A protein has these predicted regions:
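Solvent-exposed coil/turn segments that connect beta secondary-structure elements
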Residues: 46-48, 72, 79-80, 117-120, ...
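Sec-dependent bacterial lipoprotein signal peptides
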Residues: 1-18
Length: 230
């Protein structure tokens, strides 16, 4: 009886874990046949809504690899950023509202990726400390101006370190450890976490074979999309 109860509970928990999830094809149908999947993407300067001035640089420096690993050709972000800077565009909000087709004519890219940094907070609670990072991603077709993929991803990373058992020492250690935190791995982590939901691109060995992967949070998809209308 007890074993049956435990088994039933396990099934319920598994089913609950699947609630609110969609397959990649259900969530992003325009990334699968008969639609034409984008091959290349240009990343515009990040929109920074956080209080961390260096957040855009951290995110931009870690964006290329996860999207390239997922099968897309990403135009070199440093070169693209310099081109925008020469035109006086330093922030993504300056580009919002412009037709995506301009990126096709100017860069030859099939898609444009908009990135919004919603949160980059360092939190201290006596002996505990963490960094919370929340990013929204929206991929738009430069041919149709339609949203192909959108996602909102947030992570919380503990920066306190191990306890020594001495409260005063631990308080000082937590402050120092958090102040010296290397944020590059955190930026990589949030980008990689979001890309899990992105359908594989042309250069990935499993392209068009991931449509039934049920890994897309409906809530995260809609929150990401909402950034384009704010």
């Amino acid at each position: 009886m007890r074993k049956t109860l435990i088994s039933s509970l396990a099934i319920v928990l598994i089913l609950q874990g699947c609630v609110g999830l969609e397959t990649k094809k259900e969530a992003f149908p325009m990334m699968y046949p008969p639609y034409e999947k984008p091959v290349s993407m240009v990343v515009v300067p990040a929109i920074n809504k956080s209080t961390a001035a260096d957040a855009p640089e951290l995110i931009n420096s870690t964006l290329t690899m996860p999207f390239a690993d997922n099968g897309y050709y990403v135009l070199p972000i440093s070169i693209v950023s310099n081109i925008f800077a020469n035109e006086g565009i330093l922030e993504g909000s300056q580009i919002l509202g412009l037709p995506a087709s301009m990126f096709k004519s100017n860069f030859g890219a099939d898609s444009v990726l908009y990135v919004t940094i919603n949160k980059w907070d360092t939190n201290y609670i006596v002996l505990a400390a963490n960094v919370t990072v929340g990013i929204s991603y929206v991929l738009v077709s430069t041919k149709t101006d339609e949203i192909l993929w959108s996602y909102d991803h947030q992570i919380v990373v503990d920066t306190a370190g191990d306890s020594s058992g001495v409260i005063l020492f631990d308080v000082l250690k937590t402050a120092v450890t958090t102040a010296m935190t290397d944020y590059i791995p955190i930026a990589r982590q949030v980008n990689q976490g979001a890309v899990v939901s992105l359908p594989y691109g042309k250069y990935h060995p499993n392209v068009a074979m991931d449509g039934e992967m049920k890994v897309v949070s409906k809530r995260a998809k809609e929150q990401g999309k909402s950034q384009m209308v704010q």
